Amino acid sequence: MKSESWFKRADALLAAFFIPVAIMILIFVQRQIFPFGDNSFLRTDMYHQYAPFFSEFQYKLKHGQSLLYSWDIGMGVNFSALYAYYLASPLNWLIVFCPKFLVIEFMTYMIVVKIGLSGLAMTYYLQKYSKKEGMGTAFFGIGYALSGYMAAYSWNIMWLDCIILLPLIALGLERLVNKKKGLMYAICLGLSITSNYYISIMICMFLIFYFVALLVMRGVTSKKDFFIAVLQFGFFSLLAGGISAMVLLPEIFALKATASGTFNFPQVYVAYFSIIDMVARHMPGVETEIGLDHWPNIYCGVGIYLFILLYLMNKKISLKEKAVYFTMSLFFLASFAIDVLNYIWHGFHYPNSLPARQSFIYIFLVLFMAFRAYDKFRANTLKELGMATVGSLGFILLAQKTVEQKHFGFGVYYASLILIAIYALLLYLWKKKRINVNALIIATLVILSVEMTANTGLTSVTTVSRKDYKDDNADVANVLKDLPNDTFYRFEKVTRKTKDDGAWMNFHSVSLFSSTARAALSDFSKEMGTEASTNAYSITGSTPLVDMLYAVKYGIYTGESNDPNVEYVTHSNNIYLYENPYTLPIGYLVGPGFETSWDRTFRSPADVQNNLTQIIGTSPVLLEEEGEKDGSTYTFTTSEKGRYYVYINDSSIKTVKVKSSKDNIDQTFENVDRGYFIDLGYVDKGITYSVRNDDNKEMDASAYRFDYKALKEAYDMLNISPFTVTHYDSRTVEGTVDAGPEEVLMTSIPYDEGWTVYVDGVKTKPRKGLDTFLALDLTEGKHEIKMKFTPQGLYPGMVISGGSILVLVLIAVFFNRRKKVLDTKEENHQEVLQENAQK
């Protein structure tokens, strides 16, 4: 019996893992995703952020670099915070064994594995809960693994560990409440928080409700019983948080400096949509929502309609259980629809796209209820099956009449009707014992697999060209490989695929797109006329003056540059490397009144840059051209050969088209409301440009020519006594500088409390210069300076994590020894009983 039991259990667990994996691989074959073709599964942020960050992580591991800081993106970032937000899954460390050219595939097939593990974890939970190991548990595990949530968000690889761990955390909490055993709960929740704190916030909020629900269902016998349960829940929850403290604390400190670090509680209550509209999204083939609309992605098999109704009618399931689980499910539906609840669930923020990120918990709940109905189906009558079938079909027909969402195609309703009829027929045959159990299981698995394959294939797995993403990588590496590395400088790609190209190709850069982006740098970027938004800033719109201030020594161009003011270095195929002749080091000296004198509040960043040159006593670098405004069009003609820029003064204009008299071709510039200069490049005299917007808004724009002679003046003034870098590594910078009276060392290193600075061996507190950068007030004379980065909260976090793990180990040892003592006593007692019986 034991081997038979294991076979059944393993059968269900293997099916729950391998069927979703096989379905995903089948879809990959159809989509020609590598190695089955030349496409890749780089969807949205996976394309722009995750692939570069995984590349940077792998590079650091393989080259023995610190995981605390990175120079390759954002002018320098707290990598421990970026790691905590994007990379903290323990499975990600396997990337050290992956070759560089397969980083995308490592991510892609890790997603597939995690989808399979999600199904396995859900099935394991249902087996442990029901103490049954039949194949039926796998049906609901497959539904969990290939849910609408996964169809919408499976590319969000950083969330998937939490999806896997949720059933195990729930099982651990049930053991804690019912058996007073908290180790599994603390370990699984600790792993979840460590892997992704953001999704774990939602899990923790759910656990509070679930803890109360478990107490209600179990029944509380006394105040003492209640107090002990609450104390244990709080204690093991704190231990779980403590386990993750080493990763979590640096992340918390870093997020305080982001644009998302503030809270704006909604003042008006708004309902987004009706319950019918939401529940209709349980149908297969419904297009997923990942944009700014609030629709939840809650599909997990259309059979849910049948089973939830059967669950509510089943007399073997207690009324208390039904009330608790149904109430929790309704609360989740309300949370999807009501803005205040939506705001709270998302960590007291409105999500910037990717709505209803907590909906996987709702899916877990409804699948549990569906499984309970399946498990107790023998208690349902044929009449109840008929009522559930009619109710399900009736709801689908009602939804077809009332739902007006764009996500519902013609076939959604008909496929749902057919599938409900098939599942109802299978249940009827099972009820009447007119079908062999093995045949029933196989038929159900086949139909369920077809449904899940169709839904995932229709609503998920978009692709991009793998070749296009990687085509210039080898050439970029070739042009950079022979550059000297004895001092610090930055690069920028003129034509980028992402803002995080520096991380993808491992060179020091300015641009960054990350949820950990510092708000101060975004603000400063806009002031200087380079692109910036809530969680990103880039070199787009940069002038040579900005490049100079940011220590951008080299530009990586696709094709040759016609600008005579940059110096050719080398090229590889169509990738060219040019050197900017005027580049300041990572630090430069300014006078004591520099920061207060520089006015960065001008409407135009051209005025901001010119004001900088004015206060250091040099000529303006951006010279305004004469132009004409005519409704939604602005035109100007270049007065002489040079580098030209256009700035759109109206931030309500998002997209413009620029046409030159030279080629008469429209060039579209998007997101100009992000405050960046439109770089027209180096052009001849007498070229007429027209700038227009198609929204018929009044065009308010200005054109400028850049003056390289003025740039040299500014460079000579700021580089009189430069900061000379003598050594630097992934978290340290050392150098010397000869300061005048009351001069300030202004760096292009983003300010962070984690920097520790020593001036001539004496620890010196740095300050925030220009509200953005690391700055040092120096005394007159030559100084040796050392700067080292250690994230805020790292050492306290290590102590807390170490202490929490130690406490868990001691608890485990204590209960293990206690169990051995009790087992020994029981054995001795049985021996005594046997001896007495023999006498």
For every predicted segment, state its role:
Residues 118-126, 165-177, 205-213, 305-312, ...:
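Transmembrane alpha-helical segments
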Residues 176, 180, 199, 323-343, ...:
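Contiguous transmembrane helix-bundle modules in multi-pass membrane proteins
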Residues 2-5, 53, 617-833, 838-839:
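Active-site-proximal, structured, solvent-exposed surfaces of multi-pass membrane proteins
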Residues 22-122, 142-163, 195, 202, ...:
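Membrane-interface coil-to-helix junctions
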Residues 1-33, 228, 232, 438-444, ...:
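Start-transfer (signal-anchor) and selected internal transmembrane alpha helices
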Residues 20-21, 111, 115-129, 134-219, ...:
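Membrane-embedded helix bundles of polyisoprenyl
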Residues 447-467, 479-550, 582-616, 714-717, ...:
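Extracytoplasmic/lumenal acceptor-recognition loop(s) of multi-pass membrane glycoenzymes
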Residues 44, 48-59, 90, 229-315, ...:
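Periplasmic/ER-lumenal interhelical loops and adjacent helix-loop junctions
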